[in-house]
UniProtKB/Swiss-Prot annotation:
Name of the protein described by the UniProt record: Putative RNA polymerase II subunit B1 CTD phosphatase rpap-2
Keyword vocabulary terms for this entry: Hydrolase, Metal-binding, Nucleus, Protein phosphatase, Zinc, Zinc-finger
Cross-referenced Pfam families: RPAP2_Rtr1 (PF04181)
Gene Ontology terms: cellular component: cytoplasm; nucleus
Amino-acid positions noted as binding Zn(2+) in the UniProt annotation, renumbered to this chain: 59, 64, 97, 101
Assigned protein family: Belongs to the RPAP2 family.
Recorded name of the encoding gene: rpap-2
Top-rank taxon, per record: Eukaryota
Amino-acid biosynthesis is among the record's keywords: no
Length: 455
């Protein structure tokens, strides 16, 4: 029987093979060698090859012997304010000598596997796949940038023919007999003589007027609508009008003089008690679940914040300074009876059950992956058992993820200021939670207050 290789040794050998492939592709010369090594790479491994070649002052695409052009950058560094770190400002296109090499690299990267070799192993789909490596006849799907228009004018001067076009209708043109002199002149323009019409200009204006009148008729004069004044009634006619109005009022009555009835007020109906109890029950089970998770360590983490810890050494020193007595029996590391850590296993099951829903919330809120580390740190302090780690529906898991996000907002003060300003939920978080699990702004604010009271 063949002896099976341990999993750790397999993973180590696959990792070493990927690193060797990256080192080989740094100094590769032809595309045939490149095609042999592609089954060992994944997308991030290809990015490492491009980065290493760029650091070595080579074009990012393997088998290209040219160097990337030197580009003067206005911005050398990029600041991440939330993480408090400074990164070097780089663009992916600047790592290649031309647009063609950049398109070749993108073409090869799309064919690679997303998962690394040490996770998938040498599967048949990976080894038997035919990778296409672009050569010099490769046609880029994106056309190269054309030269600016100004440079074309400088290189090839040409004559531009402009067709005649009517700017305005002739009947709408307004021509003046004489040009009006400007009312006020600037002190700089006082020496310039005002423009005066010559005899030729007057003849030209006269001919245009004749052409307009012969083809379109004389210009229409603006007729102002004059409102006729109201006729003044004589005393006899006014008396007749009053008599007619009196007869009409006596016959039909003056409805405007009657007192209007007060409007009918209908009291708003109260929400059905069953709906109220359903809304309260929706928050009650979630608050009870959070209560079952919370431990003194969780409350301490919420109060102190997610500060970096010094590990076991710092914990021993803090226990000594606080005068805490250490139980000697607990210091003895006894083997587990069932060969694995139950608490760690439950924690992994819990994080795995909410992982996809949490990543969806991260993408919607544009959160950094470091918030996921805070989630793991907070969840490690929970009191988990077999009944409160899994077994929920998708809608319930979305509600649990929103509640866990509220807990992380209490731990991370900066994140809490962004989404719970003055203990009120932000419109962005309200819209997302309403879409995922049907929680509105009042329910999220009440859930935030309930969780905060437990800390």
């Amino acid at each position: 029987m063949e002896t099976e290789i341990p999993v750790n040794e397999k993973e180590t050998s696959f990792r070493r093979r990927v690193y060797t492939t990256i080192e080989t592709l740094i100094d590769i010369e032809n595309t045939d060698q490149l095609q042999e090594h592609l089954p060992h790479l994944h997308c991030l491994g290809w990015d490492e090859v491009v980065e290493e070649r760029y650091v070595n002052k080579q074009c990012g695409f393997p088998s290209c012997q040219k160097a990337p052009p030197k580009i003067t950058r206005n911005q050398m560094f990029e600041i991440d304010r939330k993480e408090g770190k400074i990164f070097e400002f780089r663009k992916q296109r600047a790592k290649f000598c031309s647009e063609m090499c950049y398109q070749k690299s993108s073409f090869v990267r799309k064919q690679l596997d997303e998962h690394p070799l040490w996770i998938t192993g040498l599967t048949e789909a990976r080894t038997q796949k035919v990778y296409e490596v672009p050569d010099e006849s490769f046609v880029s799907p994106i056309a190269e940038k054309s030269e600016p228009v100004d440079s074309q004018f400088k290189k090839e001067p040409s004559i531009w023919l402009v067709t005649d076009s009517i700017i305005a209708k002739v009947q709408d043109m307004k021509l003046s007999e004489e040009a009006e002199e400007p009312k006020s002149l600037d002190p700089e323009d006082q020496d310039i003589e005002p423009f005066k019409l010559t005899d030729d200009d007057k003849d030209f204006i006269k001919s245009i007027k004749e052409f307009r009148n012969s083809n379109f008729g004389p210009p229409s004069t603006s007729k102002l609508l004059k409102t006729a004044p109201k006729p003044v009634l004589s005393a006899k006619d006014r008396k007749k009008e009053d008599e007619v109005l009196a007869k009409l009022r006596a016959k039909y009555g003056n409805k405007n003089a009657l007192q209007k009835k007060p409007p009918i007020l209908i009291e708003a109906q109260e929400i059905h008690s069953k709906l109220k109890t359903m809304e309260k029950a929706k928050e009650a089970w979630l608050v009870d679940l959070i209560k079952s998770w919370f431990t003194p360590e969780t409350r301490k983490l919420v109060r102190e914040g997610a500060r970096p810890t010094g590990g076991a050494a710092e914990q021993i020193l803090m226990d000594f300074l606080s005068g805490k007595k250490v139980d000697a029996e607990k210091l003895v590391n006894l083997p587990n009876l069932d060969k694995y850590n139950v608490k760690e296993k439950r924690l992994n099951i819990f994080l795995h059950s909410i992982r996809n829903h949490w990543m969806d919330l991260e993408a919607r809120l544009h959160l950094t992956p470091t918030r996921r580390d805070i989630l793991s740190r907070v969840a490690s302090t929970f009191q988990l058992d077999s009944e409160n780690i899994t077994g929920w529906t998708k809608r319930e898991i979305n509600s649990i993820v929103i509640a866990l996000f509220i807990v992380i907002c209490l731990v991370d003060v900066e994140l809490g200021d962004d989404y719970f300003k003055k203990d009120n939920a932000s419109p962005e978080l309200t819209a997302i939670s309403n879409e995922l699990c049907g929680l509105d702004s009042f329910q999220i604010t009440g859930l935030h207050a309930a969780i905060k009271s437990q800390c």
